[in-house]
Design a protein with these regions (language model features):
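Carbohydrate-active enzyme catalytic cores, enriched for enzymes
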Residues: 67, 71-202, 207, 395-400, ...
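CBM-like, beta-strand-rich accessory domains located in the C-terminal region of large
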Residues: 24, 214-426
Length: 426
């Protein structure tokens, strides 16, 4: 009798639409539970109605949670892989009553996308709430262990992944220009990651336990913790009304070179000292800043990151670049930084110049605790270790500059950046 009463309570609760977390993956798990309950207890009065309700809700949520290009819209490759497993199990259950064909097409699309969610060492690409150093095989049972060579653009999802060969190793560029909701989203608009010869070079801070008010979690979510432009020591907004979907505006690719562009209009920023789950609309700082980022990659030769910001008011802009904990920064010349490992092996040189051919002075932080955490890397979602962050501070209304990562380091001249016709030509 207790079991029947408990089942009845579950039916009542799970068939109350206002109680379903339709905005997140939790809602899909709730409806999978209701469908399982309905199919396994067909003799209960509400089982038929419960199964119908669950199937309808699942169909509606699938349309909400996935882009047409096969990307899960929660900003995290880790959760993308979780969803592939979940939907595969749901499809194989036999409970969908005719919906299997549409779900089969979706699962196939998600599996194809999932094959791109690994870095050059077969670990899950750490965007959003994805931990560093998680093997893909621990998240997805269908992983075949192959790194896809070439370009994958999720135009509607807002993600670009470019994999290229480097002898028997691999290079990888990841450009994240996605903002669909608050789900597992960090303040990381136009963030980039880069691996060179299978060595992570530009890295993400990763994620941290879901205790939103602890400093490590707040740092891992922050704008300054990512490879993007921090403005006035504030975070980018993650209010849903500020979401822009995909900020990818251009992709051009040839055998030798990849060029991609993303653009975001910032209308408010948020204090980096407020936990994300406690931010109120009144905490927003109103701004009107356009940020355009152009990335030019010639694999094994160079990576150039061009940033253009435009505002009527003066701001402090700092493009931050975070390096893997195994790498160190040294000053090669007055205008060039070198990236080396503990054994002195050189990976690249870095230069940063504005559109007037002025070299921009760098700042470096590693393992900073005060006045705010900076220069840290969450290696497993529970512990942070020191890593080096390099920034290039600028103050003004509008600026354009380029940061070049030179992989050849063979008498390369200084970068030359010019624009014309209102920024239409570079």
């Amino acid at each position: 009798m207790r079991f029947v009463i408990a089942a009845e309570l579950h039916f009542n609760e799970l068939m109350e639409e206002s109680r379903i977390a339709t905005h997140s993956n939790h809602g899909l798990f709730q409806m999978a539970g209701l469908l399982s309950l309905s199919e396994n207890l067909p003799w209960m009065k509400k089982s038929e109605k419960g199964a119908f309700f669950a199937r309808e809700m699942i169909q509606n949520m699938l349309e909400m949670h996935f882009a047409d290009d096969g990307l899960h819209l929660e900003h995290s490759p880790d959760y993308h892989l979780w969803m592939v497993n979940h939907l595969q199990s749901l499809k194989e259950s036999g409970w969908l009553n005719g919906q299997e064909s549409s779900l089969t097409d979706l699962v196939k699309s998600l599996e194809d996308s999932a094959n791109w969610m690994c870095d050059t060492n077969h670990k899950v690409i750490p965007i959003g709430d994805t931990a560093n150093n998680v093997l893909v095989t621990k998240r997805w049972r269908g992983y075949q262990g192959q790194i896809n060579i070439g370009l994958r653009v999720f135009e509607k999802g807002g993600l670009l992944i470019h994999n290229s060969k480097a002898g028997d190793r691999f290079n990888q560029l990841v450009f994240s220009a996605q903002f669909h909701s608050r789900q597992h989203k960090h303040a990381d608009h136009l963030n980039i990651l880069y691996s060179l010869n299978s060595q992570p070079l530009l890295v993400d801070p990763g994620t941290f336990t879901y205790q939103y008010d602890i400093p490590e979690r707040m740092y891992c979510e922050s704008t300054r913790g990512h490879n993007t432009v921090e403005i006035d020591s504030l975070n980018y907004s993650r209010f849903r009304q500020d979401s822009f979907g995909s900020a990818l505006t251009m992709v051009a690719n040839s055998e030798l070179c990849l060029i991609t562009e993303g653009q975001v209009q910032h209308t408010r920023l948020i204090s980096s000292t407020i936990p994300n789950n406690k931010i109120k609309s009144s905490d927003g700082v109103e701004v009107n800043i356009n940020h355009r980022r152009i990335i030019i990659e010639r694999p094994n030769f160079f990576l150039a990151v061009i940033d253009e910001v435009d505002s009527e008011n003066e701001h402090e802009y700092i493009p931050w670049f975070h390096f893997h904990p195994d790498l160190q920064i040294r000053r090669d010349t007055t205008t060039r930084l070198g990236v080396v490992d503990d054994e002195g092996v050189r990976y690249c040189q870095i230069q940063c110049y504005d559109s007037e051919s002025n070299s921009i002075e760098s700042v470096e932080v590693r393992g900073q605790e005060s006045p705010r955490l900076h220069g840290w890397y969450s290696k497993n979602g529970r512990e942070v270790i020191e890593s080096t962050a390099v920034g290039y501070p600028l103050v003004g209304n509008s600026y354009m500059w380029v940061t070049v990562f030179d992989f050849r380091m063979e008498k390369t001249g200084k970068p030359y950046l010019r624009r014309g016709t209102g920024g239409k030509y570079l």
